[in-house]
Swiss-Prot record:
Similarity section: Belongs to the endonuclease V family.
EC number: 3.1.21.7
Annotated gene: nfi
InterPro entries associated with the record: Endonuclease-V
Function according to Swiss-Prot or TrEMBL: DNA repair enzyme involved in the repair of deaminated bases. Selectively cleaves double-stranded DNA at the second phosphodiester bond 3' to a deoxyinosine leaving behind the intact lesion on the nicked DNA.
BP terms from Gene Ontology: DNA repair
Entry keywords, A to Z: Cytoplasm, DNA damage, DNA repair, Endonuclease, Hydrolase, Magnesium, Metal-binding, Nuclease
GO cellular component, one term: cytoplasm
Domain of life: Archaea
The name this protein goes by in its record: Endonuclease V
UniProt source species: Pyrococcus furiosus (strain ATCC 43587 / DSM 3638 / JCM 8422 / Vc1)
Binding positions (Mg(2+)): D35, E99
Length: 191
């Protein structure tokens, strides 16, 4: 049996590890993006790395692993951490876009924050919808995306990076590519 009260307390404690600080956007050369899809008891994570600010694809990679945690709203970080960490392992990027929330979360600690805290790298939460109970000061809507701080970045810098990577549909191009790759049949790496 999963104890949601304990998990809630763990999440609140972990949220204190988030650091918001400005980054030098002129030094950002590679932006990674990661998304996960599910089929049966398997998770498929896709990683895409693009040049910044051009958005030109440098690398794509997908991995498949077993699912170890059920889907529980607002505890997504427990389900997606393993596949995401496997997908970004040994990859070189300056900032990571995560399909999911960062501080735009009822406990101010979503998936993007968790990944950023674990990796000690700048992460940005990018989501298509808001969760209930989210404070308006934790996100900015950019195109069709709700952008929030994951870790080691300010909301202003996160917005500036996402704005430069929007596609014609108003969503960050690297995340759209990662989404499509995560839903394709086979797993592979391409440079």
């Amino acid at each position: 049996m999963i104890d949601l009260r304990k998990l809630t307390e763990v999440q609140r404690r972990l949220s204190r590890k988030i650091v918001e600080k400005p980054i030098d956007i002129a030094k950002v050369k590679r932006v990674g993006a990661v998304d996960v899809s599910y089929k049966n008891n398997f998770a498929k994570a896709a990683f895409v790395c693009v040049e910044f600010p051009s958005g030109e694809i440098i690398k794509t990679k997908t991995i498949v692993t077993t699912v170890e945690f059920p889907y529980i709203p607002t505890f997504f970080f427990l389900r997606e951490t393993k596949p995401i960490l496997l997908a970004v392992k040994d990859e070189n990027f300056d900032v990571l876009l995560v399909e999911g929330h960062g501080k735009a979360h009822p406990r101010r600690y979503g998936l993007a924050s968790h990944i950023g805290v674990i990796l000690s790298k700048p992460t940005i939460g990018v989501a298509k919808r808001l969760l209930r109970g989210v404070s308006k000061d934790t996100y900015v809507k950019v195109g069709k995306a709700f952008v929030s701080v994951g870790n080691l970045i300010t909301l202003n810098d996160a917005v500036r990076i996402v704005e430069k990577l929007l596609d014609e549909n108003g969503y960050p191009k690297p995340l759209n590519i990662a989404d499509k790759l995560s839903k394709r049949g086979e797993s592979r790496e391409k440079e």
